[in-house]
Swiss-Prot record:
Taxonomy, superkingdom: Archaea
KW Nucleotidyltransferase (keyword) present: yes
EC class (word): transferase
SMART domains found in the cross-reference section: TOPRIM (SM00493)
Protein's name according to its UniProt entry: DNA primase DnaG
Gene: dnaG
Temperature-dependent activity: Optimum temperature is 70 degrees Celsius.
Chain's role: RNA polymerase that catalyzes the synthesis of short RNA molecules used as primers for DNA polymerase during DNA replication. Can use NTPs but not dNTPs. Binds DNA. Also part of the exosome, which is a complex involved in RNA degradation. Acts as a poly(A)-binding protein that enhances the interaction between heteromeric, adenine-rich transcripts and the exosome.
GO cellular-component term (any): primosome complex
EC numbers, comma separated: 2.7.7.101
NCBIfam families: PRK04031.1-1
Limits of the Toprim domain: 169-247
Phylogenetic placement of the source organism: Archaea, Thermoproteota, Thermoprotei, Sulfolobales, Sulfolobaceae
UniProt keyword list: DNA replication, DNA-directed RNA polymerase, Exosome, Magnesium, Metal-binding, Nucleotidyltransferase, Primosome, Transcription, Transferase
Subunit organization: Forms a ternary complex with MCM helicase and DNA. Component of the archaeal exosome complex. Interacts with Csl4 but not with Rrp4.
Length: 406
């Protein structure tokens, strides 16, 4: 789901040593993590579109580094101010002492808001001439209409939910708060989120599911969705049907038509699990990785012969189910191990030609491919390939299945 940003947080910084952009970004993420819980985790906020990409400009002079940072924010004023204060608290970049100071928080909507206000005044003025207007009555009507679709909190765990989770005989289970908001937007009010649980499913949800006539698990079309379903079942949550977003897509970003299509294509749980098991068995029959074995990556124009070192083949076999990725240089030397959700911001921060190969337990998307092409990355090996409209000529892409079945 994409949001229009409301504010630009602008800060200046000084570091008592020579550092790069990646060092500054790493310090910001590392030193603000868990300060105020997951709700204000910068990576989570970026994943949900509530914060934009952190822009860093660095200059070095006399053995020191200084520069400016811009953090686009779609949070409210109080939350945006809190993010600014969190970043100001960063006092180390790498081994060096540092100082971060807020320059300003710019309201990038200000001019647009002024025009809207002036236009609203004109509309109200002309409307008043035509008909006597009780403005309090209008406000009350609008307020009542909005409250119908407002998100609620359910149970002692305060799970994000729609207003009808108690009274509707059917229940839709999704992963997170953003998924609930999106379904509410299109009129689905019997929805509740597990809030991304991957080790402990809330007891409230387990009990609620057993009270319902029909329970649908509606999950993202990626490996994360697979893990959530596994946890739901292992915690004895009643699931009757499984619906999935298209491969590589998230429930929170689907349109009304896409949501309706996904739900209409839902499968009974037993049928869905049988389908998954058959797919896993087909892959398991071919789990053989030979040392230095050439792997073919086919495109519509050519067949590229690729040789993978034995240690890379071993690494690929370890990755499924970890939601992790590995970045390598041109000689297959390890650069960094990262979480799948951090791959794009990490690549954005690296200089061109720094990373040559990426192996990760995730979906290869158009956005990742475009960025890889821009950064001159040679090859990406992922768990699956998502909806790709255009394949860059300079990037080879493979899946784990391509490797282990060769």
């Amino acid at each position: 789901m994409s949001f229009q940003m409301k504010y630009d947080i602008r800060l200046r910084f000084e570091v008592e040593g020579i550092v790069e952009k990646t060092d500054v970004i790493g310090a910001i993420f590392g030193q603000t993590e868990n300060l105020f819980g997951d709700e204000f985790d910068l990576r989570e906020l970026q994943d949900k579109g509530r914060l934009g990409r952190i822009i860093v400009e660095v200059k070095t002079k006399g053995g020191k580094s200084e520069g400016e940072i811009i953090i686009p924010s779609n949070l409210d004023r109080i939350e945006t101010a809190l993010i600014a204060a969190m970043v100001e608290s960063v006092d180390k970049v790498g081994p060096y002492n540092s100082k971060f100071e807020l320059i300003e928080i710019e309201d990038i909507r200000a001019e647009k808001l002024k025009k809207i206000i002036e236009r609203a005044k004109g509309i109200l003025s002309s409307w008043s001439k035509e008909k006597s207007l009780d403005i309090k009555e209008v406000i009350n009507e609008i307020s009542s209409a909005v409250k119908v679709g407002e998100i609620t909190e359910y149970g002692p765990e305060r799970l994000p939910a729609g207003p009808d989770v108690d009274k509707d005989p059917n229940l839709i289970i999704v992963e997170g708060r953003a998924d609930v908001i999106n379904l509410l937007r299109y009129g689905y009010k019997n929805v509740i989120a597990v809030e991304g649980a991957t080790s402990r499913i809330p007891e409230t949800l387990i009990n609620l599911s057993k009270m319902k006539k029909t329970v649908i698990a509606f999950l993202d079309g990626d490996h994360g969705g697979d893990l959530i379903l596994k946890e739901l079942l292992s915690n004895n949550v009643k699931i009757d049907f499984v619906a999935r977003a298209p491969i590589g897509r998230e429930v929170e970003e689907l349109t009304g038509k896409e949501i309706a299509k996904a739900l209409s294509n839902m499968m009974p749980l037993t049928q869905y699990l049988k389908k998954v098991q058959e797919a896993e068995q087909a892959i398991a029959k071919n789990v053989i990785a030979k040392e230095e074995k050439p792997i073919q990556s086919e495109t519509t124009q050519q067949v590229v012969q690729i040789t993978l070192p034995q240690n890379i083949l071993e690494e690929i076999k370890k990755l499924p189910g970890t939601l992790e990725g590995v970045l390598y240089d041109n000689n297959w030397n390890l650069i960094e191990k990262v979480q799948v959700r951090d791959i794009i911001p990490k690549l954005e921060a690296y200089e061109d030609n720094k990373v040559a190969y990426i192996i990760f337990d995730g979906v290869i998307t158009q956005r990742l491919l475009d960025l890889a092409s821009q950064k001159n990355i040679k090859m990406i090996i992922g768990a699956r390939i998502g909806g790709i409209n255009k394949r860059p000529q300079n990037v080879d892409i493979l899946t784990f299945t391509d490797i282990i079945s060769s």
